[in-house]
């Protein structure tokens, strides 16, 4: 069984005894502590006074031993109390206290050896004193270690508090950062939604513009086709007119040929303008494809869409101008057709009159004198009708009746006047 913790070998080193043998032992111990002359008297020579004195000395020694035992008990209890407190406070100090306990055990063994070897008691006591001093030094060192450990503990506690405060600050900063990240995420999602809506709107606007461009191209192709049909009709009309003019009148053919050449030049210019507009349309289509490629850059795409819209409006205005010019040319063509019809009618009338004159000449051939007069009478309307083509053509604005010197000036003036 394990002995109680408060009972150590140090407490059992010296126990007072009331027996004479115990007194003699204690007397022997006291004689070894400093009174050897009084204890080495033979027992057979002792007197009652000597015995009484020995008893008194024995009592004094017992008191001294009791006091020393009490002091040792107190020190042992103090050491045990200190050891228990240190064991409760710091577990790793058990090694030092274990060394002290081993030292106490060794001292108890030495005390037993002192009981067996009384002649070495003083040396053992001195060694005990030395051991006590060593224990005091160890105690001081242990106290210093405990003080340093307490300082380290306080420092670690202060560091722990600082780390706790820093952790709390970091947690608050992390919460703020997480809130800010959530806000930024929501803003980013809203911005992405707005950008996606803007991109969809721009895509729809681009598709509508492409559809309008396709419609404009279809309208341009339709107008070109109509213009080609008009040109074919014009060429046919011109051929008929040319044939008729060759058969009817040579001088009018030359003047009308010049006018038709001018009309051909106008038609050629209109065709060139159509080709140029077709090139512009192709260029706009390429720009639209480039706009599709650059769709990711929304601000640049928006600016390009504005430019594209302006170009589209300019193209529409140019097409409107071209349509007006085409209408003007068509009106001129209709006017030429009407003039051709009028000339054809006049030629037919003149031919009919000539036939009537010939028949009249054949019927009334004897009176020859009136013939030239009648011939001149019938030729005057023809000559009067032929005289206007001999005159230079008049380039007149149909809107403000401006007289232009040539066809180019008239075209420029008509475009400005229409605008």
UniProtKB/Swiss-Prot annotation:
One of its GO terms (cellular component) is nucleus. It is found in: Cytoplasm; Nucleus. Keywords: Coiled coil, Cytoplasm, Disulfide bond, DNA damage, Isopeptide bond, Metal-binding, Nucleus, Phosphoprotein, Transcription, Transcription regulation, Ubl conjugation, Zinc, Zinc-finger. Residues 251-419 are annotated as: Required for interaction with TNFAIP3. The modification Phosphoserine is found at residues 31, 43, 68, 376, 387. Gene3D superfamilies: L1 transposable element, trimerization domain, Nemo cc2-lz domain - 1d5 darpin complex. Zn(2+) binds at residues 397, 400, 413, 417. Residues 150-257 are annotated as: Interaction with TANK. Residues 246-365 are annotated as: Self-association. Residues 242-350 are annotated as: Ubiquitin-binding (UBAN). Phosphorylation at Ser-68 attenuates aminoterminal homodimerization. Residues 382-419 are annotated as: Interaction with CYLD. GO terms for molecular function: K63-linked polyubiquitin modification-dependent protein binding; linear polyubiquitin binding; protein heterodimerization activity; protein homodimerization activity; zinc ion binding. Residues 1-48, 356-394 are annotated as: Disordered. It holds the Pfam family zf_C2H2_10. Residues 1-197 are annotated as: Required for interaction with and ubiquitination by MARCHF2. Residues 322-343 are annotated as: Leucine-zipper. Residues 49-353 form a coiled coil. There is a cross-link at residues 277, 309 (Glycyl lysine isopeptide (Lys-Gly) (interchain with G-Cter in SUMO)). There is a cross-link at residues 111, 139, 143, 226, 246, 264, 277, 283, 285, 292, 302, 309, 321, 325-326, 399 (Glycyl lysine isopeptide (Lys-Gly) (interchain with G-Cter in ubiquitin)). InterPro entries: CC2-LZ_dom (IPR032419), NEMO_N (IPR021063), NEMO_ZF (IPR034735), Optineurin/NFkB_EssMod (IPR051301). Its main location: cytoplasm. PROSITE patterns: ZF_CCHC_NOA. Homodimer; disulfide-linked. Component of the I-kappa-B-kinase (IKK) core complex consisting of CHUK, IKBKB and IKBKG; probably four alpha/CHUK-beta/IKBKB dimers are associated with four gamma/IKBKG subunits. The IKK core complex seems to associate with regulatory or adapter proteins to form a IKK-signalosome holo-complex. The IKK complex associates with TERF2IP/RAP1, leading to promote IKK-mediated phosphorylation of RELA/p65. Part of a complex composed of NCOA2, NCOA3, CHUK/IKKA, IKBKB, IKBKG and CREBBP. Interacts with COPS3, CYLD, NALP2, TRPC4AP and PIDD1. This is NF-kappa-B essential modulator. It comes from Bos taurus. The lineage of its organism: Eukaryota, Metazoa, Chordata, Craniata, Vertebrata.
């Amino acid at each position: 069984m394990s002995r109680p913790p408060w009972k150590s070998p140090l407490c059992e080193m010296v126990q007072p005894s009331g027996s004479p043998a115990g007194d003699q032992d204690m007397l022997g111990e006291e004689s070894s502590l400093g009174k050897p002359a009084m204890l080495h008297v033979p027992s057979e020579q002792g007197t009652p006074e000597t015995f009484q004195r020995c008893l008194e000395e024995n009592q004094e020694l017992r008191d001294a031993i009791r006091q020393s035992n009490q002091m040792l008990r107190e020190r042992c209890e103090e050491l045990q109390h200190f050891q228990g407190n240190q064991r409760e406070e710091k577990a790793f100090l058990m090694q030092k206290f274990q060394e002290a306990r081993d030292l106490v055990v060794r001292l108890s063994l030495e005390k037993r050896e002192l009981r067996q070897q009384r002649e070495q008691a003083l040396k053992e006591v001195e060694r005990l004193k030395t051991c006590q001093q060593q224990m005091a030094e160890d105690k001081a060192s242990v106290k210093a270690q405990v003080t340093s450990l307490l300082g380290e503990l306080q420092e670690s506690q202060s560091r722990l508090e600082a780390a706790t405060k820093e952790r709390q600050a970091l947690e608050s900063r992390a919460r703020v950062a997480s809130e800010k990240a959530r806000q930024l995420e929501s803003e980013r999602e809203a911005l992405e939604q707005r950008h996606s809506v803007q991109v969809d709107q721009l895509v729809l606007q681009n598709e509508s513009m492409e559809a309008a461009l396709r419609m404009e191209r279809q309208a341009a192709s339709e107008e070109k086709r109509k213009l080609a049909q008009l040109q074919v009709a014009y060429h046919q009309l011109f051929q008929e007119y040319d044939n008729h003019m060759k058969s009817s009148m040579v001088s009018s053919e030359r003047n009308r040929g010049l006018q038709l050449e001018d009309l051909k030049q106008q038609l050629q210019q209109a065709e060139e303008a159509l080709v140029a507009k077709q090139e512009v349309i192709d260029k706009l289509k390429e720009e639209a494809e480039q706009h599709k490629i650059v769709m990711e850059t929304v601000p640049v795409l928006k600016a390009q869409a504005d430019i594209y819209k302006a170009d589209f409006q300019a193209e529409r205005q140019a097409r409107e101008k071209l349509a007006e010019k085409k209408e003007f040319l068509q009106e001129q063509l209709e006017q030429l057709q009407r003039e051709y019809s009028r000339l054809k009618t006049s030629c037919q009338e003149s031919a009919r009159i000539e036939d009537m004159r010939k028949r009249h000449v054949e019927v009334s051939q004897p009176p020859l004198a009136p013939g030239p007069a009648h011939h001149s009478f019938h030729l005057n309307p023809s000559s009067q009708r032929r005289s206007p083509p001999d005159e230079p053509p008049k380039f007149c604005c149909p809107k403000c009746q401006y007289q232009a010197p040539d066809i180019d000036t008239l075209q420029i003036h008509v475009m400005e006047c229409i605008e």
